UniProtKB/Swiss-Prot annotation:
The keyword Cell inner membrane applies. It comes from the Bacteria. F(1)F(0) ATP synthase produces ATP from ADP in the presence of a proton or sodium gradient. F-type ATPases consist of two structural domains, F(1) containing the extramembraneous catalytic core and F(0) containing the membrane proton channel, linked together by a central stalk and a peripheral stalk. During catalysis, ATP synthesis in the catalytic domain of F(1) is coupled via a rotary mechanism of the central stalk subunits to proton translocation. This is ATP synthase subunit delta. It is found in: Cell inner membrane. F-type ATPases have 2 components, F(1) - the catalytic core - and F(0) - the membrane proton channel. F(1) has five subunits: alpha(3), beta(3), gamma(1), delta(1), epsilon(1). F(0) has three main subunits: a(1), b(2) and c(10-14). The alpha and beta chains form an alternating ring which encloses part of the gamma chain. F(1) is attached to F(0) by a central stalk formed by the gamma and epsilon chains, while a peripheral stalk is formed by the delta and b chains. It holds the Pfam family OSCP. It comes from Chromohalobacter salexigens (strain ATCC BAA-138 / DSM 3043 / CIP 106854 / NCIMB 13768 / 1H11). The gene is atpH. HAMAP family: ATP_synth_delta_bact (MF_01416). Keywords: ATP synthesis, Cell inner membrane, Cell membrane, CF(1), Hydrogen ion transport, Ion transport, Membrane, Transport. InterPro entries: ATP_synth_OSCP/delta_N_sf, ATPase_OSCP/d_CS, ATPase_OSCP/dsu. SUPFAM superfamilies: N-terminal domain of the delta subunit of the F1F0-ATP synthase (SSF47928).
Length: 178
């Protein structure tokens, strides 16, 4: 995984800079997501990407055919990635592209895991506090995990804020056993 991320980063940066310079971030984002979905498919990976009998150009051509209508510049980008034998890194490239796009747009996806369903007012209050703290636009996804017993866990990028009862009990147990 670390190797894939290392390989993906410069490709994602190049794709991002091209898309930003040509004011096509949204288009590239959607089309890269489509290509990512195809490349990450287990059947496609087993039959095409990991098939040693196919050349890099054949693999790339099959990927582009399955993806359907893509911008010509994105097709050229995928051909470049494929010609270097890096199609397996395409999902990681797409993910890195989205990280760069979110940073550029000062936006972050936040996952709120709570013990119980949150109403709209509670979600808005959390979103406002996070927007102020992170200085970013916030997109919220909520999930319920009854095992938390109470409170919430907030995940925003690399930042995790654990305000759950389960988390507090775990920290208390660790402090007492130290």
């Amino acid at each position: 995984m670390a190797e894939t991320s290392t390989v993906a980063r410069p490709y994602a940066k190049a794709a991002f800079e091209y898309a930003r310079d040509h004011k096509a971030l949204e288009a590239w984002s959607g089309q890269l997501a489509s290509a990512k979905q195809v490349a990450a498919d287990a059947d496609f990976d087993a039959k095409v990407v990991s098939n040693p009998k196919l050349s890099h150009d054949q693999k790339t051509a099959l990927l582009l055919e399955v993806c359907g209508e893509l911008d010509e510049s994105l097709c050229n980008f995928i051909r470049t990635v494929g010609s270097r034998g890096r199609l397996a890194a395409l999902p990681a490239i797409a993910e890195q592209f989205e990280v760069l796009r979110a940073e550029e747009e000062k936006r972050v996806d936040v996952t709120i895991v709570s013990a119980f369903d949150l109403d709209a007012a509670q979600q808005d209050k959390l979103a406002t506090a996070l927007k102020k703290r992170l200085n970013r636009e916030i997109s919220i996804t909520t999930r319920v995990d009854r095992a938390l017993m109470g409170g919430v866990i907030l995940r925003a990028g690399d930042t995790v804020i654990d305000g759950s009862v389960r988390g507090r009990l775990t920290r208390l147990r660790d402090a007492l056993s130290a």
